[in-house]
Amino acid sequence: MPREIPSPVAGAATLEETVDAIAAGFDPRVEESVEAAAVHLARLANNRTFLGDLLLDQLRDAHRTELGAGGYGPQAIVLSPVVGGCFLRANIWPGERDKCLRASGATSLVYGIAHDHNFDFLTAGYFGPGYRSDYYEIEYGDIAGYRGETVALRFVERSALHRGRM
């Protein structure tokens, strides 16, 4: 279940500074380390030009030849190699009225498909109104785990990851 982390961090960082800072000793099992990584991520999110500049550079340099190399969908951009068991990526979630979503369809971008993340992650809203998510809880002990199994879901909330939210 997500938790909101206050991110009133001043100053901005480059992608390289963020990758280096997190690689210097991030341990997701230690709360203080997660909090420190959140500060670094918030500073990167305060850098209002890095992502647009990176995308333009990658398009100019024909980066699209590596599309899919990260094992993610078309909206994911891998920002760093795996270092210390973690990496940085950016996701672009088109709005309902965006041409690419209308052309490709919502399911091609995994919209409206329930899923359970089997890993923890920090995420920060960077641009736009933010993607909306519905959050549910389940009783893992009640699940056998076979394909097609009906699972009881308990609705928790709907929220949006807007700019400045972490």
Describe the role of every protein-language-model region.
Residues Y135-E137:
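Glycine-rich, histidine-containing beta strand-loop boundary motifs that form or position
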Residues E4-E96:
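A short, N-terminal "cap"/entry segment at the start of jelly-roll beta-barrel domains
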Residues P129-S133:
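Short beta-strand segments in beta-sandwich/barrel cores
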Residues H117, T123, E139-M166:
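Short acidic-glycine-tyrosine-enriched beta hairpin
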